[in-house]
Curated annotation (Swiss-Prot):
UniProt protein name: Serine--tRNA ligase
InterPro entries: aa-tRNA-synt_IIb, aa-tRNA-synth_II, aa-tRNA-synth_II/BPL/LPL, Ser-tRNA-ligase_type_1, Ser-tRNA-synth_1_N, SerRS_1_N_sf, SerRS_core, tRNA-bd_arm
Keywords from the UniProt entry: Aminoacyl-tRNA synthetase, ATP-binding, Cytoplasm, Ligase, Nucleotide-binding, Protein biosynthesis
Keyword Cell membrane carried by entry: no
SUPFAM superfamilies for this protein: Class II aaRS and biotin synthetases, tRNA-binding arm
Protein's UniProt keywords contain Cytoplasm: yes
One Pfam family from the record: tRNA-synt_2b
Family, per entry: Belongs to the class-II aminoacyl-tRNA synthetase family. Type-1 seryl-tRNA synthetase subfamily.
Binding site for ATP: R262, S263, E264, E349, I350, S351, S352
Species assigned in the record: Lactococcus lactis subsp. lactis (strain IL1403)
Length: 423
């Protein structure tokens, strides 16, 4: 959530930055007008309350002197009625103001490329060599079905589209990957967590998924309204919701593997086959809590942590800085890691690493106490390290052999009982 004081102090600057994120200036002008009216009413209400207190003192003095206080009582009743009316108007204005501000995206960092969509993203670097084949590489869904390790047909029968069963070596490969990822992040100082897989709506608000992206989630239809997590970012970030941390302990780093549940609203017709876009998938998440002056260094380190996984798996990838028009709602700056998918002859997203600055911390009220004892908002960061199903897809396609078998990357073999080839 944006700081209303910042909008107030630099309206034109904030409006210009938000325009690059598709926010119309009229919406901000409405917010600005409501804020002015709100402050005027607060001043008026406080003046009337001071007047009421003064009249109350007069009534007490008159009564102590056994005099007639009816005039003062009538005056106080009139003032009280005015205060009640102003406070009611103020409550309505604050509700309208809040409805606007909670739907505004984060301000982009100055280094974030300005653009309308993914076509304006900027490639930062490419790492690794894309493989060459002396045969036509198959898509991962065909490889998985032919090997009997991925079963979409029965996943569809049991649940519906965009669901599948991992079977045998497929299930072992998935498990090997997320155990490998967690171990690697543990070496980098991340504390491993197992989170709840359902959260309350306050948690969804804290990280910015609610209310704007409610249609993208699966929500329990009862009086509790719990939500199946779309990413472990939600429970991990909300772990410290409403708390004040010791600045000496920052940065704090968490990692967790969890299922992620997404309705994929608006994705009809996109990636209808394979592991790229599912309603349920495993993901290893990284979350950091950092001091504001250290958060961008921590973003680079987090991105390097995600890259480390791809490098050790021997997968070619590229790093892309997302444009203002393609970046997530809560992010100020985002790097996407895109892995090479041979059958599609392109790079596909496998990780997003973002610095949300104090945007989520303000929504979730996560603060820290600095060396001087001052309490202030910290910065939150999150990143995929990595999306496990997409990593399975990348391994199947990049490590495929002409006979349809899959060579297991060396770093995963200890996690798979020494298995070298899936066939």
């Amino acid at each position: 959530m944006l700081d209303i004081k910042k909008i107030r102090a630099d309206f034109d600057g904030v409006a210009a930055k938000l325009a690059t994120r598709g926010v119309e200036k009229e919406k901000l002008e409405k917010l600005h007008d409501l804020d002015i009216k709100r402050r005027e009413l607060i001043v008026k209400s406080e003046a009337l309350k001071a007047e009421r207190n003064s009249v109350s003192d007069e009534i007490s003095q008159v009564k102590r002197a056994k005099g007639d206080a009816s005039a003062q009582i009538a005056a106080m009743q009139k003032v009280s009625a005015e205060i009640k009316a102003i406070d009611a108007e103020l409550a309505e204005i604050e509700e309208n103001l809040n409805e606007i501000i909670i739907m505004l995206p984060n301000l982009p960092h100055e280094s974030t490329p300005i653009g309308a969509d993914e076509d304006d993203n900027v490639e930062v670097r490419r790492v690794g060599q894309t493989p060459t084949f002396n045969f036509e590489p198959k898509a991962h869904w065909d490889l998985g079905e032919d090997l009997g390790i991925l079963d979409w047909e029965r996943g569809g029968k049991v649940t519906g589209s965009r669901f599948l069963f991992y079977k045998g070596a497929g299930a072992r490969l998935e498990r090997a990957l997320y155990n490998f990822m967690l171990d690697e992040h543990g070496k980098e100082g991340y504390t491993e967590m197992i989170t709840p897989y359902m959260v309350n709506q306050e948690s969804m608000f804290g990280t910015g998924q609610y209310p704007k992206f409610k249609e993208d989630t699966f929500e329990l239809k009862d009086d509790r309204g719990f939500v199946l997590i779309p990413t472990a970012e939600v429970p991990l970030t909300n772990y410290y919701r409403g708390e004040i941390l010791d600045g000496a302990e920052l940065p704090i780093k968490f990692t967790a593997m969890s299922p992620s549940f997404r309705s994929e609203a608006g994705s009809a017709g996109r990636d209808t086959r394979g592991l790229i876009r599912l309603h349920q998938f495993h993901k290893v998440e990284m979350v950091k809590f950092a001091k504001p002056d250290q958060s961008y260094d921590e973003l680079e380190k987090m991105t390097a942590n995600a890259e480390n996984i791809l490098q050790k798996l021997g997968l070619a990838y590229r790093v892309v800085a997302l444009s203002t028009g393609d970046m997530g709602f809560s992010a100020a700056k985002t790097y996407d890691l895109e892995v090479w998918i041979p059958a599609q002859n392109t790079y596909r997203e496998i990780s997003s690493c973002s610095n949300c600055e104090d945007f989520q911390a303000r929504r979730a009220q996560i603060r820290y106490r600095d060396e001087e004892g001052k309490v202030q908002l910290l910065h939150t960061l999150n990143g995929s390290g990595l999306a496990v199903g997409r990593t399975v897809a990348a391994i199947l396609e990049n490590y495929q052999n002409e006979d349809g078998s899959i060579t297991v990357p060396e770093v995963l073999r200890p996690y798979m009982g020494g298995l070298e080839v899936i066939k």
